[in-house]
């Protein structure tokens, strides 16, 4: 409402997750929430386009290094689901993408930057920042 009232246009970039596109073990709640977030972004893109408000989504895969999500029970749950130790999580996540890269917070920031500073005619779109997870390729 505020952005519409200001009549300046603008950008909304939501951070969702690769898990909204592809399923994983023991992940129903999180995956469902992220899929809903991605669809909400597309709906808002259509709804707000006449106001020149662009809505896009950045989809990271597991950002293990530098993310507080791994400090709680989440890391233990993910490690258990994959049958590995918590210490093995960064390498495990890197090996499951085709570039074999660990995804860092600055990689997500680069995705946001691309929407804000470069892709100025983009709305309703998704950039995956996941090192290439074929099952999560946007179709």
Question: At which residue positions do the language-model features occur?
Answer:
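C-terminal substrate-recognition "lid" of short-chain dehydrogenase/reductases
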Residues: 99-129, 134
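Active-site loop-to-helix junction immediately N-terminal to the catalytic Tyr of the SDR YXXXK motif
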Residues: 23-31, 43
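Residue(s) in the substrate-gating loop at a strand-loop-helix junction
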Residues: 17
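Active-site helix of classical SDR
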Residues: 8, 33, 41
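Hydrophobic alpha-helix immediately C-terminal to the catalytic Tyr-X-X-X-Lys motif of short-chain
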Residues: 36, 40-44, 48, 58
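Alpha-helical segment proximal to the catalytic Tyr-Lys
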Residues: 1, 5, 46-47
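A glycine/serine/threonine-rich, flexible loop-to-helix segment
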Residues: 63-96, 138-139
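Short, small/polar-rich loop/turn modules that mediate ligand/substrate recognition or access, typified
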Residues: 49, 54, 122-124
